[in-house]
Design a protein with these regions (language model features):
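Catalytic-core environment of secreted peptidases
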Residues: 197-199, 203-211, 219, 429-430, ...
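Subtilisin-like serine protease catalytic core
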Residues: 54, 71-73, 136, 166-200, ...
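Beta-sheet-dominated interaction scaffolds and their linkers
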Residues: 502-507, 601-638, 660-664, 679-684, ...
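N-terminal domain-start motif of subtilase-like serine proteases
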Residues: 33-53, 111-114, 123-135, 151-180, ...
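Substrate-binding/access-modulating region of protease and related hydrolase catalytic domains
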Residues: 235, 253-480, 513-516, 536-553
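Surface-exposed binding patches on compact interaction domains or structured appendages
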Residues: 588-591, 602-616, 638-678, 720, ...
Length: 830
């Protein structure tokens, strides 16, 4: 995972900060803002070098009115077709009335997407006055930023592909529909024929969800959706799909769209993802969700945004109420924690089945890498080979470290001369490590040392176009090579070692921002074969292979389809519980890295006991003496009486002991028993979080594992820098004073880095005596970064402030509850 401060435009967040201080209330609501008003910028502290994308001033407005999912839940899950169509129409009408009332008050809103099935909300491009009015208005749960989601795959091509080995005897997923929320699918692929419907295009206006070509390069077709479809239902001769009898409903929510560089990149906006989830639960769009897909796969990730209250998280919960299980990729940003991790959205939703990646290949290749600078040894260790070609003999190379980000093959050249020829190219892996390594190879490098992103062993070894060794090195080693260009890099001949299931080094860790365990489980996600045909180096036919948490999520989505056929009475909530509860722990990695462990479909299919919820989230614990209580409903889905023994697996000296209402339960067939679980903090601990696993073992049956977690500390100092460009100024909309706020934190830890976000940030105005005048702005679900906005000298109501002294206060609330951090700064209006 790459952690650095980047410069990126996120006008939405800035506008949320500037909204009420730039333009008086009552203006024309949806007109584009003037770009000369003031600073509008966001600079994040976390993230991989993905394509920079501006979302404009798009926001998601979540309303308090009932959605279809709310109505169905209130009816106990029982509703007729006519009921559901009526409720959807009522939700749309209530939304229309709300927008109409705003228009009559002079705030015109033109929604881009309207959501009524999974939640009641709409997205729109809003100006400052509209955001101000909505934040203050009853009937609005909140105004949230529209963010960007990217395919969670490390791209690879032909060589060494293998299958995940997930099967159920006599079960193929027949009769089960999987909604694939991704790029378009290449419907011409022969090994997908008969398994993929025409689908729905959310991004464009096509009649189906076919894969689109890059507007500036027709040869570059969207591939990610095709690869995911192949993993689930493909019928290739080398590696078949997990659920070959299932049907894919492709919903194109991502694709080639304009980026900030003036080029095109493949991505989705979160409002497009929401629109796709709306169609997943109501494919024909008639307002009745009885035709909902059983499974919705989201192999895209909104980086680091593991918020439990976001519109996307709410929509995933709504989809579950409508009986659609959402399977989501955890992310490819590597280890993090020990409390909050690197999991993205929508995987952070409490109702999503978040999936991490495991490397399940039988063997990998290691090489010894030694880096020397004079008499100093900077690195001496066995390193997994990531590239296609192992060295045939020991290579002695000088490093060539690139100081600037790599964006194309030209990055390796200076005025036509290669910067890396005959050397070991030291370069950031970027969003696509395989492509970066290929560019270095074309520039004549003899080896590639990738940093800033952990690459799974052999993960790009499937790319035959890379004819040199590719290794992943620590950031510290890369920085040392930047300082010492005369160092010597030695790469020894390889040796092959047998593999056991190991968590892929790129797979994101939790916890989510509500303290929930994420990912819930792991699945094979490295080097899996797809239906992408190609040619190997010897000219023989080969098939593409992909790696990433999206790959693992596709495997689990296929497994869920098999389970849905095998257990047709299981609803979405039960499917999730069966898959999570039956997994197998691997290695010694913490619960936050693997949840319950590696997918075991056979155990899930034969389970006699279902635990709801399958994950226990205690949230944030208080001080000494804190106690948290949760209840687990245990349902006997077998035909026999079950005697169940419950174990906490804890030692006696645990700092956060977990106690149970019963250690032994007897449950009749079809009956439900409740198990009380209490966690308490008995002494001060330095740890950021505590976690563990409950084990429920029926006599003569398969055990069920339930992970739990408690976040032990409330983060402090959520507001860092608070600066004002001018402390004395006249009111001006054209030349405002610039306020810069640094919100949230990124803390280095032994696990990697911990992302500490802000649930809500308020900007308030007070007079010279400290009396609160009112709220100027509110930003929700704030990721760590710098937020800049203009202070025009107008108050909360839009009126020009009188001459005098004022105080600007910034309050930032932590996720999971707690006391806000407050910083203030004084200024004077003259």
């Amino acid at each position: 995972m790459r952690w650095r401060e980047v410069t990126a435009v996120a006008a939405l967040v800035a506008v949320a900060a500037t909204a009420v201080v730039l333009v008086p209330a009552g203006g024309g609501g949806a007109a584009p803002p003037r770009r000369d008003i003031g600073a509008e910028a966001w600079s994040g502290l976390v993230g991989s070098p993905r394509a920079p994308v501006a979302t404009g001033q798009r926001v998601l407005v979540v309303l308090s009115s009932f959605s279809l999912a709310d109505r169905v839940a209130r009816a106990g899950g029982l509703a007729s077709d006519a009921d559901e169509r009526g409720w959807t129409a009522a939700a749309l009408a209530a939304q229309g009335q709300f927008i109409g009332n705003l228009a009559r008050e002079g705030i015109a809103i033109r929604p881009e997407f309207r959501f009524t099935r999974t939640l009641n909300a709409f997205s729109a491009t809003l100006d400052a006055s509209a955001i101000a009015a909505l934040e203050r208005r009853s009937g609005v749960k909140g105004v949230y930023p529209v963010r960007v989601a990217y395919p969670a795959t490390v791209r690879t091509t032909a060589r060494g592909a293998f299958g995940p080995g997930i099967r159920l005897a006599g079960i193929s997923g027949r009769g089960v529909t999987i909604a694939l929320l991704d790029t378009g699918v290449d419907l011409r692929k022969p090994y997908l024929h008969g398994h993929v419907l025409d689908g729905i295009d959310v991004v464009g206006d096509s009649a189906d969800a076919r894969a689109h070509a890059k507007p500036t390069d027709p040869a570059q077709l969207e591939r990610h959706g095709t690869e995911m479809a192949g993993l689930m239902v493909g019928s290739g001769p080398v590696t078949g799909g997990v659920a070959p009898g299932a049907t894919i409903l492709p919903i194109r929510v991502a694709g080639w769209q304009a980026d900030q560089r003036g080029d095109y990149a493949v991505y989705a906006r979160t409002d497009q993802l929401l629109a796709g989830l709306e169609r997943a639960v109501d494919p024909n769009g008639d307002g009745d969700a009885h035709d909902a897909a059983r499974i919705a796969l989201v192999p895209l990730v909104e980086p680091f945004a593991a918020f439990s209250d976001s519109p996307l998280a709410r929509a995933v919960e709504g989809a579950q109420r409508l009986d659609t299980l959402t399977v989501a990729a955890a992310g490819n940003d590597g280890p993090a924690g020990p409390a909050f991790g690197s999991v993205g959205g929508p995987a952070g939703s409490p109702a999503a089945l978040a999936v991490g990646a495991v490397d399940a290949r039988p063997a990998t290749t290691d090489v010894r890498l030694v880096v020397r600078a004079g008499l100093s040894v900077l690195l001496d260790r066995l390193v997994p080979l990531a590239g296609a070609t192992p060295p045939q003999r020991t290579l002695l190379l000088r490093p060539a470290a690139l100081r600037t980000p790599v964006s194309s093959a030209q990055s390796f050249f200076d005025h036509g001369s290669s910067l890396v020829a005959g050397r070991a190219a030291v370069v950031a892996g970027g969003a696509d490590p395989a492509e970066t390594a290929r560019w270095a190879s074309l520039a004549g490098a003899s080896a590639v040392l990738l940093h800033g992103r952990q690459v799974a062993p052999g993960a790009i070894g499937l790319d035959e176009r890379i004819g040199i060794p590719v290794l992943s090195v620590p950031d510290a080693t890369a920085r040392a090579l930047l300082r010492r260009p005369t160092a010597l890099v030695a790469i020894a001949a390889p040796r092959t070692k047998a593999m056991r299931n190991a968590i892929a080094p790129f797979s994101s860790w939790g916890l989510a921002f509500d303290g929930g365990v994420k990912p819930e489980l792991l699945a094979p996600g490295v080097g899996l074969g797809t239906t992408e045909p190609g040619r190997a180096a010897d000219g023989k036919q080969a098939f593409g292979a992909v790696s990433g948490s999206s790959t693992a999520a596709a495997v689990v989505a296929g497994a869920a389809a098999l389970l849905a056929e095998a257990r047709p009475d299981a609803d979405a909530r039960t499917l999730r519980a069966l898959l999570v509860g039956g997994s197998d722990r691997i290695g010694r990695e913490p619960v936050a890295a693997q949840g319950t462990g590696l997918l075991d479909l056979g155990r899930a299919a034969s389970a006699e006991l279902v635990a709801d919820p399958p994950i226990l989230t205690f949230g944030r614990g208080g001080g000494d003496g804190w106690q948290g209580r949760r209840t687990i409903r245990l349902r006997n889905v077998s035909t026999r009486r079950l005697t169940v023994f419950v174990s906490t697996g804890q030692r006696r000296n645990a700092h956060v002991p977990v106690s149970l209402s019963a250690r032994r339960l007897q449950i009749e067939p079809g009956a439900v028993a409740e198990l009380g679980v209490k966690a308490r903090l008995v002494t001060f601990v330095r740890a950021e979080a505590a976690m563990g696993t409950l084990t429920l073992t029926p006599i003569g049956g398969a055990r069920v594992r339930i992970p739990w977690a408690v976040v032990l500390r409330s983060p402090a100092n959520l507001v860092g820098t608070l600066a004002l460009s001018r402390h004395v100024f006249k009111p001006s909309q054209q030349q405002p004073a610039i306020v810069v706020v640094r919100a949230g934190r990124v803390v280095r830890s032994s696990h990697g880095n911990e992302v500490i976000p802000v649930l809500r940030m308020d900007v308030e105005l007070a007079d010279a005596k400290g009396k609160r005048i009112g709220l100027l702005a509110r930003i929700r679900d704030v990721l760590p970064g710098r937020y800049a906005f203009g202070l025009t000298g107008r108050g909360p109501g839009g009126r020009v402030l009188a001459r005098g002294r004022y105080t600007l206060r910034v309050l930032a609330w932590p996720t999971g509850g707690g006391v806000p951090t407050m910083r203030s700064i004084d200024f004077k209006i003259r």
